[in-house]
Design a protein with these regions (language model features):
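Acidic Gly/Asp/Thr-rich repetitive segments characteristic of extracellular carbohydrate-active
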Residues: 3-37
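Soluble non-cytosolic domains of exported or imported proteins
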Residues: 9-13, 74, 101, 237
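Short, solvent-exposed loop/turn elements at domain surfaces
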Residues: 13-15, 56-59
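Extracellular beta-strand-rich solenoid/capping regions of secreted or surface-exposed proteins
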Residues: 23-24, 35-50, 57-81, 86-104, ...
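Acidic, glycine- and Ser/Thr-rich low-complexity intrinsically disordered tracts
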Residues: 26-29, 44-48, 57-58, 65, ...
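Right-handed parallel beta-helix
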Residues: 50-56, 76-87, 104-114, 126-141, ...
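Extracellular beta-strand/beta-solenoid scaffold signature
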Residues: 61-71, 91-99, 114-123, 142-153, ...
Length: 273
C-alpha cells in the first residue's frame, strides 16, 4: 500500500488527482490549508483519508462531485480523519459535505459547516457508518429543501459518539433510518441562531440506544418535540428505543414533549425503555 501526500508543495497538489491515483489499501494525507472546489469521488475498496499539520478545509465553492457532494464515498472500508467540509450546495437541495453510498465509513475528528447536509447516506442495508469526535454546525439557509445536519439512510448500523451538533435550519440535527442506532455522549443542541425541527429523529423506528447525551431544543425551533420516534412507520423487525442518562432541555416557545413516539404507526410490539 502507498502513501499519497497532497499539498501545495507536494508532487500531488489536487485532491481529485489523489482520488484518481489511489489504489485499494492506500493512505491519502492532506496537508493543512484551504482547498476550494476540490471535490472528489473515492471508490477504492479500502482507504484512509487524513488531514495532517492542522485540519485542511475543503470549501465547495460552487462545485459538487457528481452533482452530489464535496466528497462521494463508495468504498468497502473507508476512514476519514481530521478534515473540514464547508459550503456544499446543489440545485436539488441535497448538497452534502460527504455523500456516503456504499460500504463501511468511519469519520473521526471532522467538521461539517454550512452544508445542505453535513453527511447524507444512501439506502443499502449492508452499509455501516461510525462518527466520532466530530462537529456539525450552521446548516445551509435558502435552499429548496430542509437542511439536515446529518441524514442517515436505511443502513445496517449507525454509531455516533462524542460529537456536537448545533444551529440547524428547517431540518433535523440528526435523522436516522438505520436498523440499529447507537448514540452516546454527544451534545445535540440547536443553540442560539438555530432553527432546527427535531433534534433527534428516527422516522422508521429501529433499534435505537440513546445514552449519556445532552439534547437541547432552541427557542426558534420549528417543531415542539425534541426527539421523534416512528413518525412514518416501523420498517425494521425490532422497534425499540432505549433512553438512559440523557439531559433533555426544551427551550422552545411551545414547551412540547421531550419525546414523541408514534405508536399508532409502529408495530404492536414497539417499546420505549
Amino acid at each position: 500500500a502507498a502513501v499519497i501526500t497532497v499539498g501545495p508543495n507536494e508532487t500531488v497538489t489536487r485532491i481529485a488527482d489523489a482520488a484518481r491515483l489511489a489504489r485499494d489499501g492506500d493512505t491519502v494525507l492532506i496537508r493543512a490549508g484551504t482547498y476550494r472546489g476540490e471535490v472528489a469521488v473515492w471508490t477504492q475498496k479500502s482507504l484512509t483519508l487524513r488531514g495532517i499539520g492542522g485540519r485542511p478545509v475543503l470549501v465547495a465553492a460552487g462545485q459538487a462531485a457528481e452533482n452530489k457532494a464535496i466528497w462521494v464515498i463508495r468504498g468497502e472500508q473507508v476512514s476519514i480523519d481530521n478534515i473540514e467540509f464547508r459550503g456544499a450546495r446543489v440545485a436539488a437541495g441535497h448538497g452534502a459535505g460527504i455523500r456516503f453510498e456504499r460500504g463501511r465509513l468511519a469519520v473521526r475528528d471532522c467538521v461539517f459547516e454550512d452544508n445542505e447536509h453535513g453527511i447524507l447516506v444512501a439506502n443499502f442495508e449492508d452499509m455501516e457508518l461510525s462518527i466520532r469526535d466530530s462537529i456539525f454546525r450552521q446548516a445551509a439557509r435558502g435552499g429548496p429543501l430542509p437542511a439536515h445536519l446529518l441524514y442517515v439512510g436505511r443502513i445496517a448500523r449507525f454509531t455516533l459518539e462524542g460529537s456536537r451538533f448545533e444551529q440547524g435550519h428547517g431540518g433535523h440535527l440528526v435523522k436516522s433510518r438505520a436498523r440499529v442506532n447507537d448514540i452516546r455522549y454527544n451534545l445535540i443542541a440547536d443553540g442560539a441562531g438555530g432553527e432546527a425541527s427535531y433534534e433527534l429523529e428516527f422516522p422508521e423506528g429501529g433499534d435505537a440506544t440513546v445514552v449519556g447525551n445532552v439534547i437541547a431544543q432552541g427557542p426558534a425551533t420549528g417543531n415542539p418535540a425534541v426527539i421523534s420516534y416512528g413518525a412514518e412507520h416501523g420498517r425494521w423487525p425490532v422497534n425499540r428505543l432505549r433512553l438512559a442518562h440523557n439531559t433533555l432541555i426544551n427551550d422552545g416557545p411551545a414547551q412540547g414533549p421531550f419525546l414523541r413516539a408514534w405508536f399508532d404507526r409502529l408495530p404492536a410490539d414497539a417499546r420505549i425503555i
